[in-house]
């Protein structure tokens, strides 16, 4: 009998959205009252979107665009919570286990620090695996530094 080693698979992804005045601000599956959200076909949650993309990349199951597409009515305004849930279900249906995820928000606002642990808890519960969240500014450089948009970078580990 041969023991086949479990080989972790790593995915990486980014997401970016333009800030839209007056739109609710969803970041890491949390609503940030008083901050403008991001435009998009969905809720504009760059953190959740980047993590979904990283998970799909790790499992070689496409990307966010192929997963939900743009222009599909059933996904108009879809939440990051729903996308993460459906992504977890897809990975499980293909025999994958999620090891962990890590996401960094890039932008001037909202301040993630006060709600970082809450974001980690919520996303970890959705995925059934540890998720770490961090944030950084770009010292006012680029579109995120000028508060024109937000971005996120994510990695994920899965195995079969």
From Swiss-Prot:
NCBIfam families, A to Z: ispF (TIGR00151)
Binding of 4-CDP-2-C-methyl-D-erythritol 2-phosphate, residues: 15-17, 41-42, 63-65, 136-139, 143, 146
Lineage: Bacteria, Bacillati, Actinomycetota, Actinomycetes, Mycobacteriales
Functional pathway: Isoprenoid biosynthesis; isopentenyl diphosphate biosynthesis via DXP pathway; isopentenyl diphosphate from 1-deoxy-D-xylulose 5-phosphate: step 4/6
Annotated positions for site Transition state stabilizer: 41, 137
Pfam families attached to this UniProt entry: YgbB (PF02542)
Subunit structure: Homotrimer.
PROSITE patterns in the cross-refs: ISPF
Keyword Cell wall biogenesis/degradation: no
Protein name: 2-C-methyl-D-erythritol 2,4-cyclodiphosphate synthase
CDD domains: MECDP_synthase
Cofactor: how bound: Binds 1 divalent metal cation per subunit.
Gene: ispF
Entries under InterPro entries matching the protein: MECDP_synthase, MECDP_synthase_CS, MECDP_synthase_sf
Function: Involved in the biosynthesis of isopentenyl diphosphate (IPP) and dimethylallyl diphosphate (DMAPP), two major building blocks of isoprenoid compounds. Catalyzes the conversion of 4-diphosphocytidyl-2-C-methyl-D-erythritol 2-phosphate (CDP-ME2P) to 2-C-methyl-D-erythritol 2,4-cyclodiphosphate (ME-CPP) with a corresponding release of cytidine 5-monophosphate (CMP).
Stated family: Belongs to the IspF family.
